[in-house]
Amino acid sequence: MSEKNALKIEKLTKIYSKKSSNKIKALNNLNLEVKEGEIFGLLGPNGAGKTTFLNILAGTVIKSSGNVNVWGYDLDNNPRQVRSSIGIVPQEVNLDAFFSPRKLLELQAGLYGIPKKDRITDTILKLVSLEKQADSYARSLSGGMKRRLLIAKAMVHRPPILVLDEPTAGVDVQ
């Protein structure tokens, strides 16, 4: 029995064009296959295109060329299906300071159309050790707590793929 591809990338290229003739090739014909159940990491120096690749998956950057396929769905033809299959934890912490972790997770679940009766907010808060801060303002959380809250937001819709950019930055060992 063959393993199913969770993620298949073929000849993925991203070129950033400046107004001048300077072009920056952030990704150049990237090919990658990640099988179901596999844990995979991207390593490389600053500016190697790791975050650009993750931003293409997240839909915040448009690829120049190539194919992105997630669980058999093509990004160009099924962007909503692809993005609902992925939980993204961005490198930058960007949370609304005046919402609580619980409220932020509830809002995120609502964006994915998850009915209130099916939401797992408290379970996720416990999983990332934020149950005691569930009703505090996000602005009162430490940097590591905010990072864990981003992980919780990425998991709220139970995606089969979790993509983390700099996942351990500012997070305590436990």
Name what the model sees in each region.
Residues P45-A48:
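Walker A (P-loop) phosphate-binding loop of ABC-type ATPase nucleotide-binding domains
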Residues G66-D74, V82:
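Conserved ABC transporter NBD signature motif
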Residues E106, G110-Q133:
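Conserved ABC ATPase "signature" region
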Residues Y137-L141:
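Conserved ABC ATPase signature
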Residues R158:
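Conserved catalytic motifs of ABC-family nucleotide-binding domains
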Residues L162-D165:
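Catalytic Walker B motif of ABC-type/P-loop ATPase nucleotide-binding domains
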